Amino acid sequence: MEPGIRVDPGCSKWDIRQKVWDYIENNNLADFPRPVHHRIPNFKESHQACQNIIDLEVFRRTWEVKVDPDKPLEGVRLAALQARKTLLVPTPRLRTGLFNKITPPPGANKEVLRICSTSQGVKDYSVPMGLDAKVQVDLVVVGSVAVSVQGWRIGKGEGFADMEYAMMVSMGAVTEHTVVVTVVHDCQVVDIPEELLEDHDLTVDFILTPTRIIKTDCKRAKPQGIIWSMITREMMGKIPILRNLQDRERRAGKDVSLKDGNASEQGSRQSPLCLPEKELGPCGSVLSEHKHLANAQLHTKLEACNLHDGATVYIGDIPSTTRVSELKSMLRERGAAPLRLTWQGAQHRAFLDYRDVAQAKQALSSLEGISINGISLLVELARTQRPKANGNQGFRNNKLRATNPSTVSQPHIPT
C-alpha cells in the first residue's frame, strides 16, 4: 500500500485535490494524460485496479453498468463489454442527454472491444439514449481524485458525477440499492473530514485499488435527486436535459425553484456593447471607483508593465453566481495568474492580461477544460487593438466591442 497523504486540519477540498495531484506527479505514479492536475488522475496500475471489478458480486449479477469516461476507468469499461453487459457512459458535458450506450459492431473481437472502451470508442461506437428510455442501473462506476475508507469522495471539482447521479435518481434509473464504485491508486485513499461533504456529494460503496478492494459500508445517504435550489439559469442553459427534468418534476408538484430564480434570463444574452464593471489595474494595482482614464494614458500604463498586443486572454460564459475571488483562486491553482484582471461579471466574462504572448498561450493551455459548477468556460485569446494616431483604443473579441473607445470605466474592486 502506498504511504498515505496527510490531510491537515481545516483543509479544503481543493487543498486535498492539490495534495493528491502533486503526490501522483512527484512520485512518478502518473500515466497519460499528463499532467494529472485538474483531471481524474490516470495512474500506471489503473488496469490492475480495474480488474478487481470482476470479483464484485454486483458486477457479476448486473446487466446494465454506467461507467464514467475517465481514462483510469478504461479497464472497467472493457470488462463490462467483454462480459456482454450493457455499457452506459455519460453524454459528454450532458449537452444532448444523460446517457450514451456503447454498441460494439457485430462479432467484435477483443481488440475491437478494447477500442470501444477508449475515449475514441465512446465517440465512434455509442448512441444517445432519451429520457424516456427504460434504464435500470444497478452499478455505477465513477472516477475520483480522493476518497476515504468511509466512502467520502472528492472529484475534480466540476460536479458532473454528482449531477449525473442526481439526474439518474430523478429519471428513475437508480434506486437506493444501486452500488457506486470508484477506482483509484492506493495513495488516493486519504482521510477526508466529513464536514467537507454536502448534500449533493456522491458517496461510494466500494473502492478498487491495485492492491485492495475496500467495502466502505457507507451509511451516508446518496443524493436523492436534483437539488434545484443549487441550479442556476446558466446551468439550465448549458445542460438542456435539466429543463426537461425540471418540467417533469414541476408537473409532479415538486418545488423546482432555481438558485437565481429572480435573476433576469437575459443575463447571458446581454448586449456586448458594455464597459468593464470591475478591473484590477496594471501590475495588480486597484483602480479607483468610476475613474475614467484616457486610452492613451491606459496604453502608457500597460507599456510600463511591458504588456504586449495579443497577451490578453478572454474568459466567457462565467456563471452569474461566480465571485471574482473564486475566479482568481482558480487561476492561481492552475498556474495562470495574470498581471491584470478585468472582471465583467454582469456580462459573464473576464479579461486576463499577461506580460507577453508566450505567457498568454501558456495560460490558455493551463485553463483548458476549466469549468465552474459544471459549466464549461469559453477561453480564448482576445484580439486587441492598439491606439491609433487619435488615441483611440479598444479590445476586440467575438463577444466584446467598446461602445465609446475614448474612455474606459474602471470601478474599484472591493477587497
Curated annotation (Swiss-Prot):
- In residue numbers, the region (Disordered) covers 252-272, 388-415
Please report the stretch or stretches of sequence annotated as the RRM domain: 311-384
The primary gene name is mthfsd
**Stretches with biased composition (Polar residues):** 390-415
Q: Which GO terms describe its molecular function?
A: RNA binding
| Keywords tagged on the record | RNA-binding
- Annotated organism of origin: Xenopus laevis (African clawed frog)
Q: What GO terms fall under cellular component here?
A: cytoplasm
Task: List the Pfam families hit by this protein, alphabetically.
Answer: 5-FTHF_cyc-lig (PF01812)
Show the InterPro entries listed in the entry: FTHF_cligase, FTHF_cligase-like_sf, MTHFSD_RRM, NagB/RpiA_transferase-like, Nucleotide-bd_a/b_plait_sf, RBD_domain_sf, RRM_dom
Protein name per UniProt? Methenyltetrahydrofolate synthase domain-containing protein
SUPFAM superfamilies named among the record's database cross-references? NagB/RpiA/CoA transferase-like, RNA-binding domain, RBD
For this protein, the record's CDD domains field holds: RRM_MTHFSD
